[in-house]
Structures are given as structure tokens and as C-alpha cells.
Regions:
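Preference for extracellular/luminal or secreted protein segments
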Residues: 1-41, 275-553
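Second-shell residues forming the walls of enzyme active-site clefts
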Residues: 12-16, 25, 52-71, 75, ...
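Short glycine-enriched loops at secondary-structure junctions
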Residues: 27-30, 79-87, 91, 129-139, ...
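Short, acidic/polar
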Residues: 27-39, 111-122, 207-214, 277-282
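Catalytic domains of carbohydrate-active enzymes, especially glycoside hydrolases
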Residues: 37-49, 118, 125-130
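A charged helix-plus-loop insertion that forms the helical arch/lid used to bind
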Residues: 93-107, 151-153
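A substrate-binding/cap region within the structured catalytic cores of diverse enzymes
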Residues: 106-124, 138-144, 148-149, 163, ...
Length: 553
């Protein structure tokens, strides 16, 4: 008898309750049999990642299969689609929407709502009904490795109003918003993918700086909120908020009055995995007040079974109150019912191609119903963002900040410095390549490796100039002799090697044009030609390409 059969045979009621609060991942572009079987028994749904998406147009068929396999109301089909640097649907080429930092820079809440309505419309067309967005984190640490351009900014009021606008936009399109990362991840210097983070300061600071955006999201009707694996010593002690009853049941539900679904951040993240292991973290999270458990991108069928078995065993052993598990399952069931009603009321999906995109919003899945008018985004080869006016590109254009002299490019050499990977964003398509002359773009690492392109080896090593290998400022300068030189960076302030490389290039070539596609905390000398896009989305790159004369405006 398999572990799967063991658990269900031993206590089928508890097994179904446990399945009813899980949204596991799966490998590949089609759900395997175990996922389809579990959906038939009452599994809450799934979480999609880039590994599940070969191309946007491919997504509708597997999401339809997930719905067809599901017993009762349709499944929760969740994804991280924030716009900007965090995209799963458009990871190959980059998002056609600017991210939160760019939208916060523009500070037009109507535009933020329109962009998120467009994101929601794209997701709804693909059969995705739950977006783990927006980020409501107030940026307090310039070196925030987890948040950065995912935040609307460093001002609590600005973040609050744009969080509310983003929630409204997504839910205008019939997609549930899951606001994150409660109680606020923007003032930490640790990425919870790698270790537990701590918010320094007391509850007074938390209430003043970090909580107002979540209060704004609640007022806007956010369907769900995601706590983070970080601790606030005065509130949670040594525990992360994600397993703290004081944070979830006391603060979020009791003080802030949130009555929607509380969704765990990925349980595979080291902040909780290293402390408890995934199964025990799941039990502690539900006991503290979590309703829906996200296992994470790498979660396997074995992880799913282990979590389900741990929940069942915890109820049997008295470590988890059975009524708490029932409460969580009931709340998720109501979420699924609301999503199913929203989908049935929506216009039929028209599919996505290089020439068209899907339907506009059909009404909010939140507290009220909001009629959604036509929206659209900047075009990309994926077919995303081709409904109505190019709101994504419009927003990206408005966000770009320009300083220094305008220069006309002549046979440019474009150096793109690959940053250290942000785990939440992963590897995604970025840069000026789609608009640059053939052979002009060279991707290098800050550590001095040519990642693609040719002809940029060290000046004294002709052999390495034939392809990927070592690269230094001298080699770049030699290759750019008599040509325009453009350097493109992301979050240069975080990496001394990136700053050193750019500084060496500027010392020899003060006519260099520097394009910052992250946060512009590190600035070149006054008089440098400089563009800051506040994110590395395809839309932001397109806007920069226009200003550089690489793309028609």
C-alpha cells in the first residue's frame, strides 16, 4: 500500500481536509497524474512557475485540464506575476509591464491600477485566477536583496496608495490579489529564501512604517495576504511571522480585521525549512493561522504527501486543532467558490497570439464589483500586452529618469552586466538586445567573464577574444574604440565589482552612456549621460531603447 493510500485509508476525512489547503507545484508543462488525481479528491489547486510555461500561448490547455480534473468548484491556480523583474508567464523575454518601483516613481495610482488590471486580464485569459501580488513592502534598506524594485518605494503613504490601486486592478480583471509580504519585508537585509530575516525596531515602528500598506490592501478588498518568513522580536519572538499566532491571529486578523485567506510563502525557503523542515513548518503555519499552504517551486510529490501526512498526524496527536484545519479548509472553499463564480461571469477567453490578447475584466473577486474597461500593455513577442493602448510601455516611458547630455549612438558597443541572481525573480530575459544592432550587445558578469558575444577579451589575450571567457575594462575599451559605448547595469549599488568596472570605463570614456535598470542608489559622476528605468522589464528596456535611438519612439 502506498503512502498516499495509507493516509487516505487511515482517515479519509482528515486527508481530504489536508488536501483542501494545499497548492503544490509540479514539473513540466502538463500536470502529472498525481496532481490530477488529487484535484479529483479535493486538492485546493496548484502553484505555477516558469518551469510550467514554455510560452504564454501554451498555458491555457494545461489550466483547462486542471479545471476539468477538479471536483466541485474550480481549483486555485496561483502564480507570482508581479510585473517588472518577477514574471513567470513572460520569463523568457521579460514582462511587458514595468514593476512596482517604476510605477511608484511615476506616482499615478490610476496608471498603477490600469497596469495591474492588464496583468490580471492576461492571467485570466490563460486560466490563472490567483496572483501572488502585489508587494506591499516599504523599502527601507537600499541593499534589500529580496525586495528592491519589487517595492513601490520608501514612502509609506506612496506604497499604501499604490498597493490599494494594484489590488483593485488585479481584482477588476477577476483575478484574486494576494498582498505580500506581511508584516513588511522592505526593511531587511536578508533574503528569506536563504535565511530568516529580522525587522529591527519595535511594534511602534512596524505600525508607523510597514503596516499601513497592508491596511490599505484590506480596505481595497484584497482576497488574500501572504506573511513572510521574518521575525519581529517584539511581536513574534524568535519565530518567523509565518508561523506566529501573535502575527497572524493576533495582529493581522484581530487588530487589522482581515477576514480573507492567509497564504504561506513557499515552505521550501530556507528561513523555515532550516528551522523546522517543510512538514513541521506546515503544521506550525496552519496552527498559527495560515489557511493555504504554498510548498514552493522545488516541491515534489513526496513533499506534498509528507505535508499532508504531517497535517493528518498533527490533528490525531493533538498538535493541531482539528477545528483550525476545518476553518482553513472552509475559508479556502469559499475562495474557490468565489473564483468559480467570477470565471463563469467572465467573457469567454479568446486566447493569445502575437496579434491579440485576452478579455478585459469581468468584475472584482474582492469586496465589491468593479466594471473593467479595455486595458492594454506594451507589446512583446509572447503576445502578452496587446489589448488596447500600450499602458505598460506608457508607464515605463513615464518612469525613466534622464540626466546628463543626450548622445547620438554610432555603431554602439553595449555592455550588459549580469547581476547576482535575485532568487524571487530568477533568470529572466532583460536588456537592450531586442532593439540593438546585431552583434552589438555583450553580456558580462561583474566578476569579469564574458557570458555571450565575442571580441571583448583582455587586450593582451587575443585568443580569448574569439568567444566567452575573461573580460576586463581594457578589452571593452579596445573593442569600443571609435564607437559609442553603453553600459547597462542592474542595482550597481549592490556590487563593488560592477561599480569598479563602470568607473574604469568612465575614466577612459567619459562619453559612456550608463543605463541603470535597477534602483539608482549608486550614481556616476555629474555630467555622465545616465538613464534610470527603475526595473528590468521588457517594457522598461523598450523605453530606454527609444531614448537611446535604438527603437522608434
Amino acid at each position: 500500500m502506498s503512502q498516499d493510500t495509507d493516509v487516505r485509508a487511515a482517515d479519509p476525512v482528515l486527508g481530504r481536509l489536508a488536501e483542501a489547503i494545499l497548492i503544490p507545484p509540479f514539473p513540466g508543462t502538463a500536470a502529472p497524474g498525481w496532481v490530477l488525481d488529487a484535484l479529483g479528491r479535493g486538492l485546493a489547486g496548484v502553484t505555477l512557475y516558469g518551469q510550467n510555461i514554455a510560452a504564454p500561448g501554451q498555458v491555457s490547455a494545461p489550466t483547462a485540464a486542471l479545471r476539468e480534473a477538479t471536483a466541485g468548484d474550480g481549483p486555485v491556480i496561483a502564480i507570482d506575476e508581479e510585473g517588472g523583474d518577477v514574471t513567470r508567464v513572460a520569463f523568457a523575454e521579460g514582462s511587458p509591464y514595468p514593476g512596482n518601483a517604476a510605477l511608484g516613481m511615476v506616482d499615478d495610482t490610476a496608471l498603477t491600477r490600469a497596469v495591474h488590471q492588464a496583468i490580471g486580464a492576461d492571467l485570466a485569459t490563460l486560466g490563472i485566477n490567483f496572483d501572488m501580488a502585489p508587494c506591499a513592502d516599504v523599502l527601507g534598506a537600499a541593499d534589500s536583496p529580496a525586495i528592491g524594485t519589487r517595492s513601490f518605494g520608501a514612502d509609506t503613504g506612496l506604497v499604501s496608495r499604490h498597493t490599494a490601486a494594484a489590488v483593485a486592478g488585479l481584482q477588476d480583471a477577476g483575478v484574486a490579489a494576494c498582498t505580500k509580504h506581511f508584516p513588511g519585508h522592505g526593511r531587511t537585509g536578508t533574503d528569506t529564501h536563504e535565511a530568516i530575516a529580522t525587522i529591527e525596531g519595535g511594534l511602534a515602528d512596524l505600525r508607523l512604517v510597514d503596516l499601513p500598506p497592508f491596511e490599505a490592501a484590506i480596505r481595497a478588498g484584497t482576497v488574500a495576504i501572504m506573511p513572510s518568513h521574518l521575525r519581529v522580536p517584539e511581536l513574534t519572538g524568535d519565530l518567523p511571522a509565518s508561523v506566529s499566532a501573535a502575527a497572524l491571529t493576533g495582529l493581522l486578523r484581530g487588530e487589522l480585521g482581515f477576514t480573507g485567506v492567509i497564504v504561506s510563502d513557499a515552505l521550501e525557503m530556507r528561513a523555515t525549512r532550516d528551522l523546522f523542515g517543510i512538514p513541521r513548518a506546515a503544521v506550525l503555519a496552519v496552527a498559527a493561522g495560515i489557511d493555504l499552504l504554498c510548498l514552493g517551486r522545488e516541491g515534489s510529490e513526496d513533499d506534498y504527501l509528507a505535508v499532508r501526512e504531517a497535517l493528518v498526524a498533527a490533528v490525531r496527536d493533538g498538535a493541531l486543532d482539528g477545528e483550525r484545519l476545518e476553518e482553513a479548509a472552509d475559508r479556502v472553499a469559499r475562495l474557490r467558490g468565489g473564483l468559480a463564480r467570477t470565471r463563469s461571469a467572465a467573457p469567454a477567453a479568446v486566447g493569445m497570439s502575437s496579434d491579440s490578447a485576452g478579455p478585459v475584466g469581468a468584475g472584482s473577486v474582492g469586496a465589491g464589483s468593479v466594471d473593467a474597461g479595455p486595458v492594454g500593455v506594451g507589446p512583446g513577442a509572447s503576445g502578452l500586452g496587446r489589448v488596447g493602448p500600450a499602458v505598460g510601455l506608457v508607464a515605463a516611458r513615464r518612469a525613466v529618469q534622464v540626466s546628463g547630455p543626450r548622445r547620438t549612438l554610432s555603431h554602439p558597443v553595449i555592455i550588459e552586466v549580469e547581476p547576482r541572481e535575485n532568487i524571487a525573480a530568477g533568470r529572466f530575459g532583460w536588456g537592450l538586445g531586442p532593439w540593438a544592432p546585431a552583434g552589438s550587445v555583450h553580456r558580462v558578469s561583474a566578476a569579469g567573464r564574458l557570458l555571450n558575444g565575442a571580441g571583448l577579451g583582455p587586450a593582451d589575450d587575443a585568443a580569448s577574444a574569439a568567444g566567452p571567457g575573461p573580460v576586463d575594462a581594457a578589452g571593452i575599451l579596445a573593442a569600443a574604440a571609435g564607437r559609442s559605448l553603453v553600459a547597462v547595469v542592474r542595482d550597481a549599488h549592490r556590487d563593488e565589482q560592477t561599480k569598479s568596472l563602470v568607473s574604469a570605463l568612465l575614466a577612459a570614456r567619459p562619453d559612456l552612456i550608463l543605463v541603470e535598470m535597477g534602483l539608482p542608489f549608486w550614481r556616476p559622476p555629474e555630467g555622465t549621460s545616465y538613464l534610470a528605468t527603475y526595473g528590468a522589464s521588457r517594457a522598461s528596456a523598450h523605453a530606454a531603447a527609444e531614448l537611446l535611438g535604438l527603437a522608434p519612439a
